[in-house]
């Protein structure tokens, strides 16, 4: 491509960004990726969820003369992307199994005639021989592979159907490739380059940091009560709650519903029609909370998810990062809350040991251990997370539970001696719950049957809470003074390191347990904008009415960040409206008049109810 032509395309990229997508400036890394794609060179893009990956191939698609093909793993994700592109006036379509034959033929005709600029397709459909024959005649100019980590067995979400994509390089040797992912360590990145056959690619790795997400951890004591309190504090905000089993998903959703909370279960065992209904209600703000297994989320592009809860610890940091990344995609404050119990880690380790030995098991063990270290960290959680991905950060973030409420320590020798002595006196045969009951002097038949109500240690810790003693024992496990014997129903047993503590030969500091979460943030202060909250509420109401009428999710009209900017700037003319991020020419034409009329009426005081 001639130099003058490349320069012309590059200047056109900024124009497309502003006029079509309504953004005034590129985010870090986007411009370099777009320029590289326009020059015909392969790219590997590692950019956080919500960092603007999609624009990296959508803008070149509108500047290059031909068809851009986007490989995407989920139908819901394709549909969502196409809806948003159509709302911006972009000729986009998808091919998937939910379409009738007539619909599919219509899309293929649009690709053949050049009417369609962006085609979204699943990998298994793309790799059919007859489809590749069609594609060869459609003048493809760019192939974008989204969720590219799925091609690598080192990745946390390997999908066999992605493995076949490597054959595309032989079929289309001159076609520029762009591989995109939010989560890939160095090993996974090298795998993606090798398996897709990328030629001397630009490797653009943006920071993994999502500064608008507050990373929090709450120790499990009475998990359901803690979860209910946490959800009620969110006051109707959109959220996702992840659990590790279908049964727990169903139970948690039912308990939330019984408290009058708008929640629904989502997992792979439900009928497809039910899953689609839950997803659409959530996308359209008709459902507050989805309780889900990891089957939910990869196809979700809802920008205003304000919190993500992991009710069970994930198996690796990559999954945790990707799932928490569903929150705050609009750039506004969001929260990631991890409920943690070391027993959950023990269960995951036991499940792992039941798998066949070999390299894959070793990889999974390494990743699980890293997740456990994140949960048990006593330093800034964001630092642990970012340094896992190799960023080498050193400054604490000031926006996680550790930074906001540093662990407080106390002289824990006496508590440790009571706990260790009780474990020894009950002959190291009982689990944590029973040991705590003995320490606190519980009056129950089981303790009397074993005669443990006659022990010296019985009731020695009754003045402190159940949660306090659970925390003490967990810390003794972390310190290597106690072990849980999984083979004996997680019975607590003393290690040799417990002896000097029992004798009082060494000092011992313990952390005060974290039982109550920090107060949720107020969006107005955290966002930093002095916006009119009443106007924001009116704009949301108008957006919902338009979205319902047009049968699209509300954020396809405008996302929350755009509405907040409107509520701050109060634009009442076309030029003022176009200066708001997220308002392009097409959206101004479609929706601008109604929003400007509402703002004008609000400013004039003519719309008081």
Curated annotation (Swiss-Prot):
Q: What does this protein do?
A: An ATP-dependent DNA helicase which unwinds DNA in a 3'-5' direction. Binds to and unwinds a wide variety of substrates including 3- and 4-way junctions (including Holliday junctions), flayed duplexes, 5'- and 3'-overhangs, blunt end duplexes and G-quadruplex DNA. Involved in the RecF recombination pathway.
PANTHER family recorded for this chain?
Answer: ATP-DEPENDENT DNA HELICASE Q1 (PTHR13710:SF105), DNA HELICASE RECQ FAMILY MEMBER (PTHR13710)
| Cofactor: binding details | Requires Mg(2+) for helicase activity.
Q: Where does Zn(2+) bind?
A: 380, 397, 400, 403
The entry's ATP-binding residues are 47-54
All copies of domain Helicase C-terminal, residue ranges: 223-371
Gene this protein is translated from: recQ
Q: What class of enzyme is it?
A: isomerase
Looking at the record's lineage, which domain of life comes first? Bacteria
Please state what the protein is called: ATP-dependent DNA helicase RecQ
* Domain annotation HRDC: ranges: 529-609
The molecular function terms of the Gene Ontology recorded here are:
3'-5' DNA helicase activity; ATP binding; ATP hydrolysis activity; DNA binding; four-way junction helicase activity; metal ion binding
Family, according to the entry, reads as follows: Belongs to the helicase family. RecQ subfamily.
Report the residue ranges that make up the Helicase ATP-binding domain in this protein. 34-202
Q: What is its EC number?
A: 5.6.2.4
In which residues does the motif DEAH box occur? 146-149
